[in-house]
């Protein structure tokens, strides 16, 4: 048996201050659930041997997973144009939160085909799972300039922190108790 459900929500409001300046935010939320159960019965199937474990007359298994994601990107965008010059400045911040939890269970020899559920009393039982949460937060700025659409220059800078950096980080800038990486670019 398989049950799968998903929910997504995305909102992106925008406010125009004038024809050159606007602010916008993108908010996204996703929830995903996955539940699976399987059963190999005793009746109609042969007993099988599991290497290094033993003989199995039937098998019950279950898998459950839930993933929850949250994303937000808020920015302000300013553009200047005249006959020869074009300049665009963008600055904002992003936040990401992702949480994934799963469990997998398996057991053998339920005793009869009327008890297809996984329980602690089954032979050769195996249980595993994952519980992973990570977050990241970034400030960013970008500047694009061109002269008569012939000569271009672009520069950007982002400052990001994430739980994936870990706690034993020596590089970057330490602010508010966490380490931030600086990522400049020019082209």
Language-model features, listed with the residues they occupy:
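Long, low-complexity, repeat-rich, intrinsically disordered, solvent-exposed domains used
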Residues: 88-90
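Outer-membrane beta-barrel signature, preferentially recognizing the C-terminal barrel domain
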Residues: 121-140
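Surface-exposed loop/turn segments flanking beta-strands in extracellular/periplasmic regions
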Residues: 1, 38-58, 99-127
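N-terminal glycine-rich FAD/FM-binding segment characteristic of electron-transfer flavoproteins
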Residues: 92-94
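Surface-exposed extracellular loop regions of Gram-negative outer-membrane beta-barrel proteins
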Residues: 4-80, 134-187
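Histidine-centered active-site/metal-ligand motif
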Residues: 85
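Alpha-helical scaffold segments in carbohydrate-active enzymes
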Residues: 96-97, 185
């Amino acid at each position: 048996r398989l049950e799968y459900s998903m929910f997504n929500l995305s909102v992106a409001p925008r406010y125009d201050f004038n024809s050159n300046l606007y602010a916008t935010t993108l908010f996204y939320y996703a929830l995903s659930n996955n539940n699976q159960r399987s059963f190999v019965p005793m009746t109609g199937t042969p007993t099988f041997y599991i290497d290094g474990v033993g003989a199995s007359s039937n098998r019950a298994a279950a898998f459950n997973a839930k993933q929850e994601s949250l994303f937000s990107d808020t920015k302000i965008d300013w553009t200047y144009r005249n006959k020869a010059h074009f300049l665009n400045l963008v600055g904002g911040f992003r936040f990401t939160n992702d949480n994934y939890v799963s469990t997998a269970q398996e057991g053998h020899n339920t005793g009869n085909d009327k008890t297809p559920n996984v329980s602690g009393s089954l032979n050769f039982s195996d249980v595993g799972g994952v519980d992973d949460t990570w977050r990241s937060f970034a400030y960013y700025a970008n500047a694009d300039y061109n002269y008569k659409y012939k000569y271009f220059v672009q520069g950007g800078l982002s400052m990001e922190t994430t739980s994936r950096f870990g706690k034993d980080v020596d590089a970057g800038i330490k602010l508010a108790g966490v380490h931030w990486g600086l990522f400049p670019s020019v082209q």
